[in-house]
Amino acid sequence: MVNILKKRAFGGAILAALLLASSAYVGAQSAPAAGAQGKTELLWFGQAGFRIKTPQGKMILIDPWITGGPKTPPMYKNDLAAIGPIDLLLVTHAHVDHLGDAPTIAKTNNTKLYGPADMVTPLTTLGVLPAELGYRFNKTGQVTPLPGIKVTAVQAEHSSLLVWKNPATDKLESHPAGEPMGYIIELENGFKIWHMGDTGLFSDMKFISEHYKPDLVLIPIGGNFTMAPDDAAYALRTWVKPKMVIPMHYNSNPMTKGTLAEFQAAMKGSNIKVIPMTEGETVQF
């Protein structure tokens, strides 16, 4: 069984509350593989940015829009070092609210940035990212970037454009950045997380779920650029059917009007555990 422990960080203070059986989110999980210790911990920075601490203590960072994020807690917004050492950096596409601080974090940590092939290429050719820190892969490509960690790139229905300030002209330039992706991340104990990235509805969500069998889904609900709450609920209830879901990509842009309350209402009566988070909060599985 999976018991979820939720924490919230504001400034330097951390409030930890243990959710007892009567109120905890509980879901089934595969038996941990031999040698896998500890729990899985997710920290949400806002938008689509998460840090995953794996059962063996590896740190995975996804879509780190930290310094520019309007809802990023100050302890991280004002000091990227507060995120801690990062072992693996994943970016779903080149839009600024996903690529964000990834190149800076990659260089600071000497950690490779894994992302869509045609996003990583302009990052390296333009000098935004050193070539040795870029790793290119594409949809359905599975990689093992760290011992015991598997990452598979999957479909996302969205767009991708790299906006870059040319230091020679001091002007912004737009560069094609390939296709966006989502990620199936399998941890040391077999626990699988599907970070959907930015996406609208597509029927192969059913295939992806049936084939990869994610335990936890991180799903956008804000609308306008991604699924709205009702679309996200339809995808989950009809096609994906995970054990647990964390809504993301809302509450950060006036154009993404979808709300947590609307999503919770659309999920009412479902057996899928909805785990709402606030920016700076962590959950443990």
Swiss-Prot record:
Superkingdom as given in the UniProt entry: Bacteria
UniProt entry keywords in alphabetical sequence: Hydrolase
Listed transmembrane segments: none
Xref: Pfam families: Lactamase_B_2
HAMAP family reported in the protein's UniProt record: UPF0173
Family the UniProt entry places it in: Belongs to the UPF0173 family.
Protein name: UPF0173 metal-dependent hydrolase Pnuc_1524
Native organism: Polynucleobacter asymbioticus (strain DSM 18221 / CIP 109841 / QLW-P1DMWA-1) (Polynucleobacter necessarius subsp. asymbioticus)
